[in-house]
Amino acid sequence: MKTNLIIRLKISSIACFMILFFFCIQNSIAQTRSAKEINYQRVENAEHIVVYQEEDKFLGWPANNGAWSADGVNMLVGFTRGDYELIIDNHNIGGNQESWLARSSDMGQTWEGFNPDNYVGDFGKEPELKTLVNPIDFSHPQFAMRVVGTSYHGSFDARGHFFFSYDAGKTWNGPYRLGDNTIREWPELKNTSLSSETELTPRTDYVVKGKDECIVFMSVRTKSEFGTDRLFSMRTVDGGKTFKFVSWVIPPYDEEKADPSAKIKLYEDEALNPHADQSRAVMSKTIILENGKLISAMRRRYNEHNWVDAYVSEDDGNTWTFLSEVGDAGAGNGNPPALNITDKGRLVAIFGNRVEPGTMMVVYSDDEGSSWSNPQILRDDYGSEDMETIDLGYPQLLKRKDGKMVALYYWSTKESLHHIAATIWDGDN
């Protein structure tokens, strides 16, 4: 009798525990769902546009390929074009991957895609590079520059090189070597914890300072070693004929030089948290404010964590300090940021989030990047043929003459597989 009573009590206890456990799980899921609904407000009056799509082709990665607009009316965005192929655990792109452009002459409302002549990829993986004889006029009203490196779709030159245009990308000059072509041998890059064999992995990020002066943001990594990219800047004061190292934005980790307090809080266990210099830093977007401050937003990664950070320089790029975390770039390999300034001086940053169902996110800063708003959904109607990989984003961000923002990114829906898309909205409202 006593034994039966004990058994009944045990069964009752287990049943109560299971009910309580189930309730807690359901409540946790509900809270998570509610948090997403509360935190992720939707951008109002956002207009989505197809920039360029092509049957049986995969189009992607504007962040790797650049975007330009000198007047807020005429706009240009680069992207990678390849054959559409279903590939397990990877991007659905195969075949030859070409660097294309799309142009708009009406503030981003309509676009035309084209394969430019004398441009990236037209001269082989490691082209014979030209030496710049006549200095570039960086102040030219229709100047555009495309910087090329390696480790991303359609670009393979570990030395790095560049093209430039004086007619807003209609025609291009290049490929030119970056100075004397010995950047990887600079002592600032050699005397680090990176291996002796490195490669340059820049996208296109530069700040024009005058007719002859330009700061170019670069990244370098140990050859073929994913995640070791670190961000630095170099400067030319003679129209691109020569370049000199300016500073590290995020240097390779050096235990003897690193500030032990500069850790990134990713885990509850403090011992697991990395130093800021131990995390990948690549694919920056840098702007200059009216007061001369340089704000650089960049893609970060450590283990499974992906996020966007902002750093600031108040001495013309000579030194950099951490400013703020811009946002969470989600799962997989994360996403790089795009950054711009509204007419009212508000900073706008966008990035993709590859957590299902897939979103384009936007955040705002009204204090020069010291803090950022809660993220808002710019777009979330993602869909693909297999939905195996949430493959989206890599944005660029241009400002129209009327002050509205134009986000450019790659996207997919069930009806229109991977294509280049734009979203137009008012970043000041």
Q: What are these model-derived regions, one by one?
A:
Residues 1-9:
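N-terminal secretory signal peptides that target proteins for export/translocation
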Residues 31-429:
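Asp-box/BNR beta-propeller blade signature and adjacent active/binding-site loops
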